[in-house]
A protein has these predicted regions:
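Divalent metal-cofactor coordination and adjacent catalytic microenvironments
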Residues: 21, 42, 131-133
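Sec/Tat signal peptide C-region and signal peptidase I cleavage site
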Residues: 24-28
Length: 139
């Protein structure tokens, strides 16, 4: 084997090794597949369920947090909620977050447009991703 061939083989080996390490690191990350644009109202319009799907690497767990803000009748209504931790599989997994109205007290969501911040967190890899989405709240 010539010196040039050895150099090319070494370079190819380094590139393959870097790709392998990069793909393993990517598996530890959390990524939204999507967040549904429609959220369902329940519990006398005090809860909106935000749904979607996520991918994260095996060996991790994920948790989803969401905050919804809606302006109606000159009132700014806000709610928050989170899921329990779920084991990651490496494949797309559905989630549903029940977002409860928290402010003002005794307020309700109304059918119509709203904004949401949806965040995914994984452990033990300690990765996260956050999306801001427009929602349509409906019964």
């Amino acid at each position: 084997m010539t010196s040039k061939s050895k150099s090319q083989l070494l370079a190819l080996s380094l590139v393959c090794g870097a790709l392998l390490l990069t793909s393993r690191a990517a598996m530890a990350q959390v990524e939204f597949v999507g967040v549904n644009a429609k959220a369902t109202l329940t519990d006398n319009n005090t809860v909106a369920t935000v749904t979607g799907s996520i991918v994260c690497g095996p060996g991790d767990t994920f948790q989803i947090n969401s905050v919804i803000q809606q302006n109606h009748a000159q009132t700014n209504v806000a709610g928050s909620g989170n899921t329990e931790p779920v084991a990651c599989t490496g494949s797309p997994q559905p989630f549903a977050v029940q977002v409860q109205v928290v402010n003002p007290p005794n307020a309700t969501f109304q059918k119509g447009p709203a904004s949401a911040i949806v965040s995914a967190f994984t452990g033990p890899s300690d990765d996260s991703q956050t999306l801001t989405v427009k929602l349509l709240l409906s019964e």
